[in-house]
């Protein structure tokens, strides 16, 4: 499958770094959700990857929070969306990658087909609303506690997205 772009919001650079790895693996463009043309680019795309980090007790990253009302107005009918989220399973074990679920709910409600769910194997958290039917709704990453697993998780996930 060809991907039209990876859209991300990043505050500390971790999500941007991961988004770059994913974009390179999928041979597609990288777009900061905070840029003025991001919403238009999403509207004009068919197959997109969306990423966010989770802050505090399950909050969206600031750039996503800023554009969420516009994002919620996008018609995702006919679009394929894959999600990735960053979180801290030791510091916030009860809200691990919860922000990914907020985006998942919006795109699903607005008609997207969501792909790229992943297994819970190898993670150590207490709770996450980003778990649906026993799987994460996308790729869950922990750059704080499991950075050594990030590249292999991205490779496996992107391989599945490409097939």
Regions found by a protein language model. Name each.
Residues 28-39:
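A short beta-strand-loop structural module common to alpha/beta enzyme folds
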Residues 3, 14, 25, 29, ...:
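FMN-binding flavodoxin-like domain, especially the glycine-rich phosphate-binding loop
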Residues 4-9:
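Short, hydrophobic/glycine-enriched beta-strand segments
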Residues 10-16:
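Glycine-rich NAD(P) Rossmann-fold beta1-alpha1 loop
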